[in-house]
């Protein structure tokens, strides 16, 4: 059988993967701090006794676009935005430490601070705040709680956000959307990052997603047309093989 059917099939498979990545990016176009996922492909020439006229395609090392998103001023005390290489530490489902740029902090029914359901990690572990307290976050990540009835100038720190610094090449996104240290980074910096006291946050501000929704929609349309073309190639190769078999049977 002509190798073209295999090359077209491989290309169609990778096109579906590209569509899945683009769909995920579109779904997170309004997620604070989201970093668009990249999908890179590379050509792999087919080696063998036949002429080198066919080339397969395979996925290359995936990654994320670390371009900062635009800043949205929300005036909400629990919304924070970080510097370019700054990350918030959170606790993942398996108890390990992960990192996110999403600064939309919520308070769960038990008083624990969370981001997308993940407990926010402070310098002394997960952070909890008193029920009904007015929460403020300072530029250095210190969280203070003002209980009802307390004087307005009362400062009662309840914890401090663990702010860490890492470049895009040092972290990898997990299936839950939380970034973790790559194996290479763990070998040089340890299993978790240490808090960086030089980092600062802006309270009442959220960094938006860096997904370009218009470009992502264009990519979806282009991927759909590319997939359709690849299916036509497979169909044409199959038809040609059928006609060749008919000619051989006639002879």
Curated annotation (Swiss-Prot):
Keywords: Bacterial flagellum. The keyword Nuclease does not apply. One of its GO terms (cellular component) is bacterial-type flagellum basal body, rod. InterPro entries: Flag_bb_rod_N, Flagellar_basal_body_rod_CS, Flagellar_FlgE/F/G, Flg_bb/hook_C_dom, FlgE/F/G-like, LlgE_F_G-like_D1. Disulfide bonds: none annotated. Pfam families: Flg_bb_rod, Flg_bbr_C, LlgE_F_G_D1. It is found in: Bacterial flagellum basal body. It comes from the Bacteria. GO terms for biological process: bacterial-type flagellum-dependent cell motility; bacterial-type flagellum-dependent swarming motility; chemotaxis. PANTHER family: FLAGELLAR BASAL-BODY ROD PROTEIN FLGF, FLAGELLAR PROTEIN. Belongs to the flagella basal body rod proteins family. The basal body constitutes a major portion of the flagellar organelle and consists of five rings (E,L,P,S, and M) mounted on a central rod. The rod consists of about 26 subunits of FlgG in the distal portion, and FlgB, FlgC and FlgF are thought to build up the proximal portion of the rod with about 6 subunits each. This is Flagellar basal-body rod protein FlgF. It comes from Escherichia coli (strain K12).
């Amino acid at each position: 059988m002509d190798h073209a059917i295999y090359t077209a099939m491989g290309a169609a498979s990778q096109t579906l993967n590209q569509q899945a990545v683009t769909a995920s990016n579109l779904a997170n176009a309004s997620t604070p701090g989201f970093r668009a996922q990249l999908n890179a492909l590379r050509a792999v020439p087919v080696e063998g006794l036949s002429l080198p006229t066919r080339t397969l395609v395979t996925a290359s090392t995936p990654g994320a676009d670390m371009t900062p998103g635009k800043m949205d001023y929300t005036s909400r005390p629990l919304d924070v935005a970080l510097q370019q290489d700054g990350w918030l530490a959170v606790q993942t489902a398996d108890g390990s430490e992960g990192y996110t740029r999403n600064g939309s902090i919520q308070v769960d029914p038990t008083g624990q601070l969370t981001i997308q359901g993940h407990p926010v990690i402070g310098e002394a572990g997960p952070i909890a705040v008193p029920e009904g307290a007015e929460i403020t976050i300072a530029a250095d990540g210190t969280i203070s709680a003002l209980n009802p009835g307390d004087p307005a100038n009362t400062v009662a720190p309840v914890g401090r956000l663990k702010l860490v610094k890492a470049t895009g090449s040092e972290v990898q996104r997990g299936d839950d959307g939380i970034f973790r240290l790559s194996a290479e980074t763990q070998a040089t910096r340890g299993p978790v990052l240490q808090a960086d006291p030089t980092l600062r946050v802006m309270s009442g501000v959220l960094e938006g997603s860096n997904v370009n929704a218009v470009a992502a929609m264009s990519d979806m349309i282009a991927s759909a047309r590319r997939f359709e073309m690849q299916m036509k190639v497979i169909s044409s190769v199959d038809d040609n093989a059928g006609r060749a078999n008919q000619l051989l049977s006639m002879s």
